[in-house]
Design a protein with these regions (language model features):
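Short donor-sugar binding/catalytic loops of nucleotide-sugar-dependent glycosyltransferases
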Residues: 246
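Alpha/beta enzyme core
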Residues: 83, 106-241, 250-265
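A short, charged, Gly/Pro-tolerant segment at domain boundaries
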Residues: 296-303
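Short acidic/polar active-site loop segments enriched in Thr and Asp
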Residues: 39-40, 45, 95, 122-125, ...
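Short gly/pro/ser/thr-enriched loop/turn and capping motifs at secondary-structure boundaries
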Residues: 48-53, 132-134, 196-199, 270-272
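C-terminal helical cap(s) of enzyme catalytic domains, especially alpha/beta-barrels
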Residues: 55-64, 200-214, 256, 268-293
Length: 303
């Protein structure tokens, strides 16, 4: 059997499979279906400083080869995540977990990361800079190298845990943003978040999503994700976590060849709740098929 282990920012993973934030809850919900310790780790639901009720419904729409969501970062806030959600997780998951953090100001991000820094089970902070900047006209932090770097630097000041910055694909030059985050002290980069999409109901001529637009994810964005992972991994010296349309062991191999150290699986969890477990179990056979002895050896192996 091939070696599935990888090292992500100094922490060893049994395998590179990571259910993506927003598609796996706080983990314990899936523990009723299978042993989630089979996973490398997972990124729990996006956490903000204060509780958020999310966007009005409908906030999910089916699309060709994917889906659109505009959930709006619904979560109980960092204090309840620490006091209620993480204790439940500790009973069923015995590995470091990735904490996904969102915010609407630099201060929001720093506060939430500082609170999570004290949690022993949190191994990495995945900082989602795709959120709108309430003090910057609503523009996403992740569309500006300077703004993304500012958040990175602020978070690095309040934590000793590895900081992975999650980037938006809705930009013209994702490489410059990744490099700005690296220069500001980021320990890793994860990409891509969802692409901006929209559907319209032909009967009432209104957007299907109450928020009008939302994040498009699923198999259709996989080639875009592979391209961006390849570009970023060739431009930075820190680890890259690849995601976007991944749904099979073959997709994982392709993403790693593009330069990903670990791979997140998002929308596919909503189609098949066992998909991440199945990918972990399928990897040895796929590795044998392509004569791969160790996954860590193929990272960035695309010629």
């Amino acid at each position: 059997m091939g070696n599935l282990s990888v090292n992500l920012c100094g922490i060893e993973l049994d395998n590179p499979i990571i259910p993506a934030s927003g598609t796996f809850g706080y983990g314990y919900e899936y523990a009723e279906l299978y042993d989630i310790n089979e996973l490398g780790t997972f990124s729990f639901k996006g956490t903000t400083k204060d509780p958020r009720f999310g966007n009005p419904t409908p906030r999910i729409a089916e699309c060709y080869s994917g889906m659109i969501n505009a959930v709006g970062l619904q979560n109980p806030g960092v204090e309840k995540v620490i006091s209620e959600e993480l204790p439940k997780l500790k009973k069923c998951f015995h590995k470091p977990v990735m904490a996904n953090v969102s915010g609407f100001s630099v201060e929001d991000y720093a506060y939430t990361c500082e609170r999570l820094d004290k949690e022993e089970q949190v191994g990495w902070l995945e900082v989602n800079v795709s959120c709108p900047n309430v003090h910057g006209g609503g523009m996403s932090f992740g569309t500006s190298p300077a703004a993304a770097a500012e958040i990175t630097a602020a978070v690095k000041k309040v934590t000793t845990k590895p900081v992975i910055i999650k980037l938006s694909p809705n930009v013209t030059d994702i490489v410059s943003i990744a490099k700005a985050c690296e220069d500001a002290g980021a320990d890793g980069i994860s990409l891509i978040n969802t692409m901006l999409g929209m559907r319209i109901n032909l009967r009432n001529r209104k957007p299907v999503i109450a928020n009008k637009m939302g994040g498009f994810s699923g198999p259709a964005i996989f080639p875009v994700a592979v391209r961006m992972v390849y570009q970023v991994s060739n431009a930075v010296k820190i680890p890259v976590v690849g995601m976007g349309g991944v749904s099979s062991a073959e997709d994982v191999i392709e993403m790693m060849l593009a330069g990903a150290t670990a791979v997140e699986v998002g929308a596919a969890n909503l189609v098949n709740p066992y998909v991440c477990r199945d990918i972990v179990r399928d990897l040895p056979e796929v590795m044998a098929k392509y004569r791969i002895n160790s996954l860590s050896e193929i990272i960035g192996g695309a010629k």
